[in-house]
Amino acid sequence: MPLRPGRCYRHFSGPAYTRKEYIPGVPMPKITKFTMGNVNGNYDYELRLVALEKGQIRHNALEAARVLALKQLTNKTGSDQNFALIVLKYPHHVIRENKMMAFAGADRLQDGMRLSFGKPIGTAARIERLGDIIMIAKVKKEHLEIAKKAFEAAASKIPLKTKIDIVPIPKEAVVQ
């Protein structure tokens, strides 16, 4: 079966479904790297991708946003030593799907909504508070516009409304 659109899983109701020790067959999340670039570098600005609404972000959307931001930052700054990119949200929540058949005679083969709990098909990160930070990038002043464009592109992969906050990093904090 093909992957359902992200709008099917954007909103949530009820508690998170996270206990993987009780759930057989949970697929691994596509996103595996959460810190990229030179994390120990000396940077001037911190860019934050902030969620403006509550919802869920599927693991493949997080991975797509990460790959796009990383590729743009690496290609346009010249090296992965000129920035630090950190994904803060982890896809803990297990997403289920009650598969339905859609062909002639399917009503004789399936049970409809009887026993409709569903099988695990993926994972999602939950954004439960407004203003939660999804990703952070740290850059020097000369790469600020490049990082802003990379985050605008990455925000298009996230199924929620987002904004980009730019915070200058104080110099005394860097020295410590």
Swiss-Prot record:
Which PROSITE patterns did the record assign? RIBOSOMAL_L10E
Please give one Gene Ontology molecular function term for this protein: structural constituent of ribosome
Please name the InterPro entries in this protein's record. Answer: Ribosomal_uL16, Ribosomal_uL16_arc, Ribosomal_uL16_CS_euk_arc, Ribosomal_uL16_dom, Ribosomal_uL16_euk_arch, Ribosomal_uL16_sf
Which cysteines bridge via disulfide bonds?
Answer: none
The keyword Ribonucleoprotein is assigned to this record: yes
Superkingdom of the organism of origin: Archaea
Work out whether the entry's keyword set contains Membrane: no
Please give an example of a GO cellular component term from this record: ribonucleoprotein complex
Record keywords, A-Z: Ribonucleoprotein, Ribosomal protein
Task: State the SUPFAM superfamilies in the record.
Answer: Ribosomal protein L16p/L10e
Tell me, what's a Pfam family for it? Ribosomal_L16
A biological process term (GO) from this entry: translation
Similarity remark: Belongs to the universal ribosomal protein uL16 family.
Specify the protein name.
Answer: Large ribosomal subunit protein uL16
